[in-house]
């Protein structure tokens, strides 16, 4: 069994504040696209450079990656939604890459030697986030990514003091900081920001393996819920989360929780045994519960 150590709250993990009078729910991700991934031909959206540090939109690019063992002809395929581009007759070799550039000439000057490239799309990638959709020649969606510059697509950090108070800010180096947005593990769904990260090198890695690539990354923690939504002082609170990984067995996660009266976090293991409000044993949904708390107690927790 491998153990992945995650950072404490303040670094992008899912945190929830519970109050027996008023409960606020965490921002939740949906599991989708987990079972059969990828759908068509193994081609996935693998890298997005949507906000160059230069602010020159002609430097934007999207990289596709063929994860399969067969070459894929993208003739008459299209990029839709965020930008619009129809592919010429171009083939992506097995386990190879194709760069789609906003302006092929500008890209070639900035990244000499990178091949193959196509380009000249209509539109501009949003700096705040939007949806990119890849369609095959029949108009069927092959892949779709809705990226963002906050939430699970960024890292939460302490903000600057403001009137003697410090709040939280989102840090996304791929948002104008000189980095691209790269897929960590193309063998897992790219629908979730947990499987993406800012490149570790300036300008990203177009036409090559991603700098953040990791075939054995920590499991994605999705669908974090608590129940009841507004707990009473007599209620134990059930916490559930779905773990998604390239391995189907041997997964484990811990729940850290702390009432506002406590200084240290308490730890409980999330279990997938069918006996902790987690549905069926072995279904990937993990559960645990925390004790009832007096009325008015706020509880911070993370998985």
Put a short name on every predicted segment.
Residues 1-23:
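N-terminal secretory signal peptides that target proteins for export/translocation
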Residues 20, 26-28, 201:
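Hydrophobic topogenic segments
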Residues 25-38:
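Bacterial N-terminal signal peptides
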Residues 39-192, 215-219, 226:
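Activation on beta-sandwich/Ig-like modules and their edge loops
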Residues 62, 77-79, 253-256, 303:
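Hydrophobic beta-strand segments
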Residues 193-302:
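Glycan-association/targeting regions that enable binding to alpha-glucans and other polysaccharides
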């Amino acid at each position: 069994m491998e153990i992945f150590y995650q950072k404490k709250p303040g670094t992008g993990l899912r945190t929830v504040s519970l109050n027996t009078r008023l409960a606020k729910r965490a921002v939740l991700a949906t599991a989708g696209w987990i079972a059969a991934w990828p759908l068509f031909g193994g081609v996935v959206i693998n890298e997005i450079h949507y906000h160059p540090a230069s602010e020159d939109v002609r430097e934007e690019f999207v990289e596709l990656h063929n994860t399969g063992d067969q070459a894929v002809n993208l003739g008459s395929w299209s990029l839709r939604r965020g930008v619009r581009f129809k592919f010429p007759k171009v083939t992506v070799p097995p386990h190879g890459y194709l760069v789609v550039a906003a302006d092929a000439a500008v890209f070639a000057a900035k990244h000499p030697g990178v091949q193959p490239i196509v380009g000249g799309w209509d539109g501009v990638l949003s700096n705040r986030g939007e949806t990119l959709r890849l369609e095959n020649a029949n108009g069927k969606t092959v892949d779709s990514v809705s990226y963002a510059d906050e939430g699970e697509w960024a890292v939460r950090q302490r903000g600057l003091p403001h009137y003697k108070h410090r709040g939280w800010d989102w840090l996304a180096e791929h948002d104008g900081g000189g980095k691209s947005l790269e897929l960590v593990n193309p063998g897992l769904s790219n629908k979730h920001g947990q499987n993406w990260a800012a490149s570790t090198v300036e300008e990203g890695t177009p036409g090559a393996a991603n700098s953040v690539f990791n075939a054995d990354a920590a499991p994605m923690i999705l669908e974090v819920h608590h129940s009841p939504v507004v707990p009473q002082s007599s209620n134990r609170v059930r916490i559930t989360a779905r773990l998604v990984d390239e391995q189907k067995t041997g997964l484990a996660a811990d729940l850290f929780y702390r009432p506002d009266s406590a200084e240290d976090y308490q730890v409980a293991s999330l279990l997938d045994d069918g006996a902790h409000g987690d549905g069926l044993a072995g279904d990937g949904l993990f559960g645990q519960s925390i004790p009832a708390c007096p009325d008015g107690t706020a509880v911070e927790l993370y998985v």
